[in-house]
Regions:
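Conserved hydrophobic beta-strand within the GNAT/NAT acetyltransferase core sheet
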Residues: 48-52, 166, 200-204
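Active-site/acyl-donor-binding loops of N-acyltransferases
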Residues: 64-85, 186, 194-233
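Short, high-confidence coil segments that cap the C-terminus of an alpha-helix
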Residues: 43-45, 136, 197
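Acyl-donor-binding surface of acyltransferase catalytic domains
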Residues: 7, 17-89, 229-231
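Conserved acetyl-CoA-binding loop-helix of GNAT-fold acetyltransferases
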Residues: 22-39, 168-171, 177-194, 212-217
């Protein structure tokens, strides 16, 4: 079980049960984590978050006695590559040029999102220093000399065979309704295929119906679900 160094907005603590973790003693482990987290330091009404990766149907019942209740599902979808050719002409992200416009569009598009919506200059700088960060795979699409959308990809070389992820994708709300979401996704997926990747992957909220419909049309299918639970002090 991994404790987050920086819990997301609205939570004082967040920890994750990683994929493949033995469920046998999970209830006891969570209870012990709560006991050692010095809950007395938190105020009444504060909330703690728990993620279970690749969640199973009975996980909610399994940990019910700990006081955690499910509230959010993040589904992982996968699709074979390549996909249909994108109609958009994109360009790569340019360091020292595109940071401000990217962060502005990201903030507008993900204002509702508890993790991606909090991305700021400092956090973005940390991500740019990650070994997987690839400027060529960070695609931007512009309209009227303005950033209209982006598709940020990530290649998981530790997977066998390597897996290509749409790490983050967004269209500026000012350009919604123009049918840009699907071709933006296709552009990212086909970049990954050009790098030799045979399977594309992304995560999406289970209640984001428009996005799910778009991804289904592209060829994505459900692979697993990460489920979030919360506990109120």
């Amino acid at each position: 079980i991994v404790i987050s160094s920086t819990p997301p907005r609205d939570y004082v603590l967040s920890f994750t049960v990683t994929e493949g973790h033995n469920r046998t003693a999970l209830n006891q482990e969570i209870s012990e984590l709560l006991d050692t987290s010095e809950l007395s330091e938190f105020q009444k009404g504060d909330e703690i978050q728990l993620w279970i990766e690749n969640s199973e149907e009975n996980d909610a019942d399994l940990i019910a006695s700990t006081g955690f209740t499910p509230y959010r599902d993040l589904v992982q979808l996968r699709c074979p590559l390549p996909v249909r050719e994108s109609k958009l002409v994109t360009r790569r992200f340019e360091l020292g040029v595109d940071e401000e416009s990217f962060l502005r569009v990201n903030s507008r598009a993900f204002a509702w999102h508890p993790e991606q919506g909090d991305l700021d200059e400092s956090t973005f700088t940390e991500l740019k220093n990650e070994p997987w960060f690839d400027l060529e795979g960070f695609l931007l699409y512009e309209l009227d000399n303005q950033l209209a959308g982006f598709c940020w990809t990530k290649i998981h070389l530790d997977d066998s065979p390597p897996l290509g992820e749409i790490y983050a994708i967004a269209i500026d709300p000012a350009y919604h309704g123009r049918g840009l979401g699907m071709p933006m996704t296709e552009a990212g997926l086909n970049y990954l295929h050009a790098k030799g990747i045979q399977t594309g992957m992304l995560y999406v909220e289970s209640d984001n119906v428009p996005a799910l419909r778009t991804y289904e049309k592209i060829g994505f299918t459900h692979f697993l679900t990460n489920r979030a639970f919360r506990y109120r002090v």
